[in-house]
Amino acid sequence: MTDHSEFDSVSGKTTTGHEWDGIKELNTPLPRWWVICFYLTIVWAIGYWIVYPAWPLISSNTTGLFGYSSRADVAVELANLEKIRGDKMAALGAASLADVEKDPALLALARAKGKTVFGDNCAPCHGSGGAGAKGFPNLNDDDWLWGGTLDQIMQTIQFGARSGHAKTHEGQMLAFGKDGVLKGDEIVTVANYVRSLSGLPTRKGYDAAKGEKIFVENCVACHGDGGKGNQEMGAPNLTDKIWLYGSDEAALIETISQGRAGVMPAWEGRLDPSTIKAMAVYVHSLGGGK
């Protein structure tokens, strides 16, 4: 049989016999070791299809000869972990808050569990570290609208504030301007008076006596004499440097005119009692708990 192979004079290799615009292609076979490895991978893939789950079906998939399922393994591990956690969380749930504080193991468990739950449920409003934001209280300081003891914190988490729960904290900042209780100039005057309570500068020439009179007639009932606040009503202390909605004149005018009524959701029914207790312990440990 006649061999019509054409050799390339430079490389000494045969060409494929094809030519495009004067360009010829060398016939360079793949290395034998590479070809062997390639076929071995095909054999391995076929074996994998047979042994392990591989092909999707209409409502399931092929299970393979080994019947292996990583999902089943994960489910078993999660069940084991849940059992371990369940026993520990049951002990946490059975203990009082005072007992949790006295037991190092339960306290560590509550803080660890509380931190995780806080990150999943509370961080979107209060921040990952509980530092808060405008309209969302800072949980690291010692300024508490509804009280900062362990029991008070747990009650707030359970029932929320203005959440609609039967046991929720009620109380809101009235809209003195919107409801026509105070006129515009009166709101400006009392806003400056409120700023003066915490040592903030006031508008030049404002009538302090008039501001105090307006405050006594309209604000003392909730915020108390001197503006020290009232935790039973969720009324903030107006004499410190902590302001939930801002301390500048414009922010205070808006607050007095339009009112404030932020909502804290009730977590009872969403989280189990042990988890709520753990969250209360964690929040209390952030630095501002009393």
From Swiss-Prot:
Compartments, record wording: Cell inner membrane
Subcellular location, principal: membrane
tRNA-binding among keywords: no
Highest taxon above the source species: Bacteria
Stretch forming the signal peptide: none
Residues holding heme c 1: C122, C125, H126, M264
Transmembrane segments: 33-53
A GO molecular-function descriptor: iron ion binding
Cofactor remark: Binds 2 heme C groups per subunit.
BP terms from Gene Ontology: oxidative phosphorylation
Keywords from the named record: Cell inner membrane, Cell membrane, Electron transport, Heme, Hydrogen ion transport, Ion transport, Iron, Membrane, Metal-binding, Oxidoreductase, Repeat, Respiratory chain, Transmembrane, Transmembrane helix, Transport
A single Gene Ontology CC term: plasma membrane
Cofactor(s) annotated in UniProt: heme c
Subunit and partners: Component of the cbb3-type cytochrome c oxidase at least composed of FixN, FixO, FixQ and FixP.
Protein family per UniProt: Belongs to the CcoP / FixP family.
Protein name: Cbb3-type cytochrome c oxidase subunit FixP
Lineage: Bacteria, Pseudomonadati, Pseudomonadota, Alphaproteobacteria, Hyphomicrobiales
Gene from which this protein is expressed: fixP
